[in-house]
Amino acid sequence: MQIASSPFTHNQRSTRRIMLLVILACIPGIIAQTYFFGYGSLIQVMLAMITALLAEGAVLQLRKQPVMARLQDNSALLTALLLGISLPPLAPWWMIVLGTLFAIVIAKQLYGGLGQNPFNPAMVGYVVLLISFPVQMTSWLPPLPLQGTSVGFYDSLLTIFTGYTHSGENIHQLQVGYDGISQATPLDTFKTSLRSQPADQILQQPIFGGVLAGLGWQWVNIGFLVGGLLLLWRKAIHWHIPVSFLLALGGCAAVSWMIAPQSFASPMLHLFSGATMLGAFFIATDPVSASTTPRGRLIFGALIGILVWLIRVYGGYPDGVAFAVLLANITVPLIDHYTQPRVYGHKSGHK
């Protein structure tokens, strides 16, 4: 069944199935993320899901809504999943709990629940954490080939809950790669290094050892791309938003890179690093907070792509997907107003 707009307000069964399909489509990306960055992401997702179900159940109870029926729509689980995989794998446990509470209680239920929220709940929770705890939110481990210390499941669990592995290493020590240099994400490394080095020298660093983009990150993005194509094939999402998002981001990156290759990242680095594919197929396509008309979706997706590029290049944050999505959410009523198909026989009011 093809859904044109906000299906969550009128068909409980289709909502549950679509949410479950989106969750399953995340699996290829989660597998890649777990392989390159450890088991922490799985632990974060589990903590987020438990918190989301408890928080949503409590609020529904207070609102005297049918708790079990509403929880079974899987929307809380999907919000928790998207937030959990967006956080650094070894972020402290209280961060994912706080972010999930904010996403479910404030960004979703405060507006009336599923189908009423004007902003993407997972991205609201993410941005709150990023602004409040910037150091912890940028503490990503090096990808597996560059890790100086391998972090197993037990050490991941210990670090998330205590801040230390069984051998006493903290997150800052774990961030040091095999070469003794503290590692960052490809986008963060490129943005920071541009202050003192040209692009061709920056790209010689080990973190950029991937064929398409950053080492490890390219496979995470490919995983979410595979899942996104599955959603398109099953018609769970429309093609307009991801295609216009990726074309706008890739186009801006290509033009700037061709003009000044020593000062701008390549289109491939933008498309296959950070949260690009996750944002294009799983976050921006949220039918509640996105535009609902075909032309509107194209404008909405392109706006997000342009904003992501602007934030990555000129902003204070290395990625920018979350901020771009929330800023675009603000424009949805205006976009929908001017892109609604004209009713047959409609005449303008002027004489």
Swiss-Prot record:
It comes from Yersinia pseudotuberculosis serotype I (strain IP32953). GO terms for cellular component: plasma membrane. Its EC number is 7.-.-.-. This is Ion-translocating oxidoreductase complex subunit D. The complex is composed of six subunits: RnfA, RnfB, RnfC, RnfD, RnfE and RnfG. Its main location: membrane. It is a multi-pass membrane protein. The modification FMN phosphoryl threonine is found at residue 185. GO terms for biological process: electron transport chain; transmembrane transport. It is found in: Cell inner membrane.
